[in-house]
Every structure is written in C-alpha cells, then in structure tokens.
C-alpha cells in the first residue's frame, strides 16, 4: 500500500507541472506576521482551559521556531521574546525529572547558550540531563508500563528530548549525552516505527488499530514531531559520528512516506492515511513536514525534484491558512491521536512549526 501511494504521488507531481514559488519578501512578511501574533498573544488562545507555565512543552516548540526564524531572518523580536522568558524563569526546566516534555524548553536554552555563552543558560538543562543519565528510568519502553512516560515511549518525545542531548554533547564536548540519546532513540524507534509504512505509531496503544477506511492509525502531528526531530538531529550531529547514517536512513525513509501522504492542495491531515474521515488540513503537522522537506532539499539529502515541489506546495498551503493578523488556523489541539480541526483552532506549536518551515523555505 505504501509503495503504491508513493508511486502515485510521484506520477501526480510529475504531471502537475506546479511551478516552484520563489521565496522572498512575501514569505518573510508572512513569517514575521505569524511570529508577532504569537508574541502579542502569548498565553492566550490555549486549546485546554487554565493557565500554562512558560516551561510547557508546547511553548518549547514555539521557542525553537522563534529562534530558528530569528537566526535566518534577523527578526529581533523573536530572540528578544525567548530571551525574556528564559531570564524571568531562571532558565529552569519543567518539574518532572524524567518526562521528555519537561526538558523540551532546554532546546531554546542551549540554542541561546551557543550564541551568548552565558553559564546561567546552560546550568539547569545540564543538571537535568546529568541526573537522568546518572539515574536512568527503570521501566519498560511502553506507554502503559508503570511509569512508562519516564522513557520515550510515545513518538512526540523524540522531538522533545533528543535534540537537547545532542546539543549538550556539542556544547560540552561530552559524548555521554549523545550515547544516552542514541540508546533511547533506538529503543523508542524499534517499538514505534512501522518500517513497512515508513511512519511512527503515536504509542503502543495504536498497534493493530485501524481508521474508518481500514488503514493503520498514524497521527499527523505525531509523525511531524518525529520527522522534524530527525532533521534537527542530522543538523546537530557531526557527519563523522558513527550514528549519523542511522538518522539519515530514517530521515530518507520517512521522506518518501511524508510526500506520499500530502494532499492535492499541499497539506497534511490529522490522520496520515485517512483523509476521508479527516478531510481538513492540520497545520502543525504540515509545518513540521514542510520544514523537514525543505531542510532536506537545502542540505542536499533530498535531491529528487518531487521533494522540492512538495516543500513548496506545503508552504503555499500553510500560508493560505494565515489570517491578516498572523494567526495560523487549522492547528489540532493538544492530544495524542487524529482529531478534526477548523479555521479557528490554533496553538503555539503550530506557530513554531510554521516558523521552522519558513526558516528553510526562504533559503530553498
């Protein structure tokens, strides 16, 4: 089924003759507008009632997008925004020692540490990672195991935590962070990656489940997390590292599946394989996939023309869902499985994914 979908996608792309949309002023203006809306509305429009800490994983995804876009565009409010949040919180992580979500904001701390070399930015995230490595979680790699969330037993975790350990190895020179990351990433992927489809299950609860159309259940954003994570890790690991080829092969395998699941308008959906039940776009997934595809094209890993076309189409579709004020719609709320979306739904990780995509599109 997977090979058939991919071949059909290649044929459709070859026949469509869709011209590549030039990156330029308009793309930069839209991305700046999205960034500014996120800054102006931070802490509002939450998909779950109540308040949210600055160290929440959803914000961590936004901070990464902000800093990535700032590096490329020079749009200073993005970096100033993340710096201000880090400083007012003393660069602290979330409360849960082992939970991958609660170290996600460490990505922003380390990205800023690489620039400013302020020890205050490094200390809390390093202490957290050192503690996890020194006293590793003693549980199975299974979401339903006792304390199962203490390991990377759900696919989102592969975005939240591994980039932190990879960056720590780079900034400290201690390869122990990378060794820990590799062990846990491999174990998680052995459990959750479906080699036949080239996609990740969200967690073990979805093994054997089927969508209404009979296809396996592969969550759009969940696979977006994983695909973006692979691009980030490949950007962080030295090419000479013995594990680099593993991540490269995983990225290439997923890339084929990702383009096969893109719809005719350029979007991805809440479910990767059931667009009938979920006919609407899902723009956190679309943002992460567009980022990964454009990143792969820019780094020379994705050389077939189909990938550049898919990235351009993904970007065009994303931009069509940005309002005049910079609000990005059709972003699925916090959850762990495919859910229907609408134009009014938005979330910070959608904005973060959009800005990550923009950072590569303008260079493509």
Which functions belong to the PLM regions below?
Residues 1-24:
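Bacterial Sec-dependent N-terminal signal peptides
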Residues 23, 27-37, 64, 68, ...:
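Charged/polar interaction segments and conserved charged motifs
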Residues 60-63, 106, 159-162, 224-227, ...:
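Membrane-embedded glycan transfer/ligation machinery
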């Amino acid at each position: 089924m997977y090979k058939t979908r991919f071949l059909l996608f290649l044929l459709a792309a070859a026949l469509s003759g869709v011209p590549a949309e030039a990156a330029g002023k308009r793309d930069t203006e839209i991305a700046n507008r999205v960034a500014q809306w996120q800054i102006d509305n931070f802490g509002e429009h939450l998909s779950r009632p109540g308040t949210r800490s600055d160290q929440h994983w959803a914000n961590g995804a936004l901070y990464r997008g902000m800093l990535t876009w700032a590096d490329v565009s020079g749009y200073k409010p993005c970096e100033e925004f993340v710096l201000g949040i880090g400083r007012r919180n003393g660069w602290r992580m979330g409360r849960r020692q082992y939970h991958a979500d609660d170290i996600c904001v460490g990505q922003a701390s380390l990205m800023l540490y690489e620039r400013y070399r302020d020890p205050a930015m490094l200390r809390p995230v390093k202490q957290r990672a050192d503690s996890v490595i020194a006293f590793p979680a003693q549980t199975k790699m299974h979401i339903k195991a006792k304390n199962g969330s203490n390991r990377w037993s759900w696919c989102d975790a592969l975005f939240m935590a591994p980039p932190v350990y990879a960056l720590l190895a780079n900034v400290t020179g201690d390869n122990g962070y990378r060794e820990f990351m590799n062990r846990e990433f491999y174990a998680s992927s052995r459990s959750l990656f479906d080699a036949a489809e080239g996609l990740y299950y969200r967690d073990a609860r979805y093994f054997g489940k089927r969508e209404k159309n009979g296809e396996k259940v592969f969550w759009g954003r969940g696979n977006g997390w994983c695909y973006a994570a692979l691009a980030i890790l490949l950007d962080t690991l030295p090419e000479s590292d013995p594990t680099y080829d593993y991540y490269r092969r995983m990225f290439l395998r997923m890339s084929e599946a990702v383009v096969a699941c893109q719809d005719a308008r350029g979007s991805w959906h809440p479910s990767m394989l059931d667009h009938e039940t979920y006919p609407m776009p899902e723009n956190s997934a679309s943002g992460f996939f567009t980022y990964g595809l454009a990143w792969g094209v820019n780094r020379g890993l994705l050389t077939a023309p189909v990938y550049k076309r898919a990235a351009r189409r993904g970007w065009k579709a994303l931009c069509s869902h940005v309002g005049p004020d910079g609000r990005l719609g059709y972003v699925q709320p916090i959850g762990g499985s495919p859910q229907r979306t609408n134009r009014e739904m938005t979330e910070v990780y959608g904005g973060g994914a959009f800005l990550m995509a923009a950072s590569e599109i303008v260079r493509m």
